[in-house]
Regions:
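Structural core of flavin- and non-heme-iron oxidoreductases
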Residues: 1-213
Length: 213
């Protein structure tokens, strides 16, 4: 397991989700307007610190990014570095020209304002100061470790959530290199073990139908 796993290995693309009518219908059906794009946009803005493209270094034909500055808000102090790379892939550069020739222009607002139609130079999770990848580990975890008393247990996997008689989570049974022990919780247990392990962990902890185990 790698700390910052997905953001450490993915393609570094940083886009918002689409602002569509389907989101509004979903919000209306469940009676919760917090699912709409305008409600979620501030959270996207809160996480990121945007740096405009360096056009001097990106001085390549068809490589000028179009974006909507209002999609970003650096006053919120987001730790995740978001910018445009200084190097441009020649194949993508050619694709940009091909889209224009086919009458498919680049989106004037990019892919950070809720519209994902057409083409766009996409923002990336790259720190422009040193051109390194900005991950959940480098942008969030390192600051948290320095500012709090957080302890990271590496090479450790949760095997069961523990509950008291009142069905309140009190800790987690974990395994480190075959050694089983318990980590106790003072306030709460946050389940964030991935799309597969999170439900599996809940099931083995008795929080689902026995038939699913």
């Amino acid at each position: 397991m790698i700390i910052g796993y997905q953001s450490l290995l993915d393609h570094q693309l940083d886009v918002s989700y689409a602002n569509t009518d389907s989101d509004q219908r979903w919000a209306d059906q469940v009676g919760d307007q917090s699912y709409t794009f305008p409600s979620l946009l501030p959270f996207f803005q809160k996480s990121a610190h945007f740096t405009p493209p360096n056009l001097t270094k990106r001085a390549t034909f068809n490589a000028t990014p179009l974006y909507d500055p209002s999609a970003f808000d650096n006053t919120k102090g987001g730790p995740l570095q978001v910018s445009y790379g200084n190097w441009v892939d020649p194949t993508i550069n050619a694709l940009s020209g091909a889209l224009r020739a086919a009458g498919i222009g680049l989106s004037p607002s990019g892919f950070s304002s809720g519209s994902l139609l057409g083409g766009a130079w996409v923002t990336s999770t790259i720190d422009p100061d040193d051109a390194t990848r900005s991950t959940s580990e480098s942008s969030y975890l390192q600051d948290a470790i320095q500012e709090t008393q957080m302890t990271v247990y590496t090479h450790t996997q949760a095997s069961k959530i523990l509950f008291n008689a009142n069905k309140k989570a009190t800790g987690v049974t974990v395994l480190t290199q075959g050694l089983e022990y318990t980590l106790s919780a003072n306030k709460e247990v946050i389940v964030s073990a991935g799309v597969f392990h999170s439900p599996q962990l809940l099931m083995v902890s008795g929080k689902t139908l026995k038939a699913c185990i």
